[in-house]
Amino acid sequence: NDYYDVNLKNNRLKILQQYDKFTFQKQNLEDKEEIDRIFKKNSPNRVIHLAAQAGVRYSIEHPEVYIQSNIVGTFNILEGCRHNKVEHLVYASTSSAYGLNTKYPFSVHDNVSHPVSLYGATKISTELMAHSYSHLYGIPTTGLRFFTVYGPWGRPDMAMFIFVKKI
């Protein structure tokens, strides 16, 4: 999509392609048949699922993108894990899950039933789906609630990137 310049992702990819065991396949997570094919072809023991449509502001104007990528896409990953006997799934969530909580610091035990963005709601949904798959199908899962991720390859819409660029 047009969320930000695709060249940033392509430049990140060039760094990873230097590693012999790294492979890259560009696929839409919501394409269940293609995700199934990738799981069958590669037979992974462990899956690290970091793909998602990120960003709170973009979710206000493009909610369908978040439902498809985050919820449907994660469902397809979970199904791939279930049908291919994956030993462990690590997936990305977000600090947006904490929504209207006012207690600081946040805790994994805090209530997350009041998201204030569709983005946060989709990521909470993926956490609940992963928890259900763990319980129903015995797939160990670990969710990571990332806060603001920054660095030289950070997303250009993030405050830190904007501030540094203006200096």
Predicted regions and their residues:
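Conserved loop-to-helix N-cap of the C-terminal "lid" that shapes the substrate pocket in Rossmann-like
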Residues: 143-146, 153-160
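Alpha-helical substrate-binding/gating segment
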Residues: 135, 161-167
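N-terminal Rossmann-like NAD(P)+-binding domain of SDR-like oxidoreductases, especially those catalyzing
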Residues: 1-149
